[in-house]
């Protein structure tokens, strides 16, 4: 009987992890309630996103390596920067002005993305 219970527990945990992973992999939907960028495989996905003024974008780190979301360029930062995000860590920012916002990962400056904010 203990073996059945153990197998059931493993199965239940597997279903839970699969469900959480599926939710976390949801990416941005223009005009949707949640605009999300996944950080995985040392890249931002989607790499470019268009939202309306007032939209909040959330970045979620799917990698097991720490990443940041740092606005501006590595050489010319703008001051908006997430803390180092661990696995499944997230950072959200609400865009209040139209424009094009570029961002990168400080530890991995080749990782870049942009958010276009339309009025």
Where are these regions (language model features)?
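Extracytoplasmic copper-binding redox domains, predominantly the cupredoxin/blue-copper superfamily
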Residues: 2-119
